[in-house]
A protein has these predicted regions:
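Structural preference for solvent-exposed beta-strand-turn elements
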Residues: 1-270
Length: 270
């Protein structure tokens, strides 16, 4: 049996939200985010948190810490220090945060003490689960309300986690409305296996025509367009034991082909 890592998108959100989950079989990015989140939760002093190479972790924690009103500096490795962060700092600063970046663009991210406005509306210029989640986590830690306009849906793991924890969050058309003033219920989260990691093995199964099942894989519809493309190419994809646990769909996946595979054209929207 092949043991795949936990879904890193969901696990990192659990780490920031301080939700319990099985910490076995997690990748380096999740470990870095978990360690940084634990350090922040246990200390009220001015901190410097190292996120290693976790772009997701540094963006999620920036939102959560900015909302908390505490002072903190977030750093990363050489690669992470070259990734732009204005897409999260700009909306947070408009909301009332005080965040500065190196060369006004890159980490280190310095967060000063501040207080966010009680109500905030933001329209996402591009589909981005990280920007959306950063703002939702800021609303939670600041106990404020936010309305996010999302014209093109992105990964909804943060919304699902908040719903699982009894938060008052819902979608109304293209709007996500979240009342962060209400306390959430901390629960154990059963994190599914990582679909992105499974994708390589799904492809290998098809290429070798092996029918080896991959068990407990997350099949959130915002993540599985890859399966649609494979089926269009002629692969036979089957989902077994599909269920929803901790508000996330999952299933065992088998993949093979019966005759031959054909080439297809895909677009960015695919």
């Amino acid at each position: 049996m092949i043991e795949l890592p936990k879904d890193k998108s969901i696990a990192q959100r659990c780490a920031v939200l301080n939700l319990d989950f099985d910490e076995r079989f997690i990748g380096e990015d999740v470990k870095n985010t978990l360690e940084a989140a634990n350090q922040f939760a246990q200390c009220n002093e001015d901190l410097t948190l190292n996120l290693g190479n976790s772009g997701t972790g540094i963006r999620l924690l920036t939102g959560y810490i900015a909302g908390s009103g505490k002072k903190c500096t977030l750093i990363g490795d050489k690669s992470l220090s070259q990734r732009p962060m204005r897409r999260i700092s700009d909306p947070l600063n408009t909301w009332g945060a005080q965040i500065s970046l190196w060369e006004d663009k890159y980490p280190p991210i310095e967060i000063a003490e501040s207080k966010l406005q009680p109500n905030f509306t933001y329209e996402l210029e591009i589909p981005s689960a990280q920007i959306k989640s950063c703002l939702l986590l800021a609303a939670l830690s600041s106990k404020t309300k936010i309305e996010i306009i999302e014209n093109i849906p992105s990964r909804d793991h943060t919304e699902r986690l908040l719903q699982e924890c009894d938060a008052e969050i819902f979608r109304e058309g293209n709007k996500i409305i979240f009342d962060g003033t209400k306390e959430i219920t901390k629960k154990f989260i059963d994190v599914p296996k990582d679909f992105s990691s499974a994708a390589y093995l799904i492809a290998a199964n098809i290429l070798t025509n092996k029918d080896i099942p991959l068990k407990g894989i997350g099949i959130n519809k915002t993540r599985t367009a890859f399966l649609n493309v494979l089926e269009e190419m002629g692969a036979k994809i089957e989902l077994h034991n599909a269920c929803i646990i901790s508000n996330e769909p999952r299933a065992d996946i088998t993949a093979r082909y019966d005759t031959y595979l054909k080439g297809v054209s895909i677009s960015g929207q695919s």
